[in-house]
Amino acid sequence: MQATKTDVRTEEFMLDYLDNAVVGLHWVDGDAKILWANKADYEPLGYTEDEYVGHSITEFHADADVINDILERLLSGQSLYNYKARLLCKDGSTKSVLIASSGLFDDANNFVHTRCFTIQDPSTT
C-alpha cells in the first residue's frame, strides 16, 4: 500500500505537533533508556537532544526513589497522573514537575515504552 500525499502531509503535521508541543513528551524503554523526546522535555532543563535522548532517564531525576517507583509502576501496567518529581537541570539546579504517563505493551503483553507527559509543577511557579 502506497502512502498518499495526504498521508505524508498528515504525518509531517503530526511530527511537527509532537516535536513542538508546549509540554514535555518522551518515550522510555524497559531499561530506562530515553528513546525519543520532544524539545519541551529537554530544552527547559538546559540539555540538547544528543545530551538527553539515548541516556537513562534516571540521570535526569534528582530523587532515585521517585524514578524507581515511577518505572516500577509503569512496567507493571499502572498509569500515573500528576506524579510529583524533581528533574536535574544541566546547570545543577532542579525543576519540580508533574508527570502523567502510561506504558505501551505489545500483543504478547511485553513492555515497549512509556508515553510520558511532563509539565512544570504549577505550585512551584
Region spans (language model):
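PAS-associated C-terminal cap
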Residues: 1-13, 119-125
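PAS-family sensory/regulatory domains
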Residues: 39, 51-64
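A short beta-strand signature of PAS-family and PAS-like sensory folds
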Residues: 33, 84-86, 101
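PAS-family sensory domains and close relatives that share small-molecule sensor folds
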Residues: 89-91, 100-106, 117-120
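PAS-family sensory domains
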Residues: 29, 35-36, 61, 82
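Sensory modules in modular signal-transduction proteins
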Residues: 7-30
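Terminal output helix/cap of sensory domains in signal transduction proteins
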Residues: 63-93
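PAS/LOV sensory domain surfaces, especially short acidic/polar patches at coil-to-helix junctions
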Residues: 31, 35, 39-43, 55
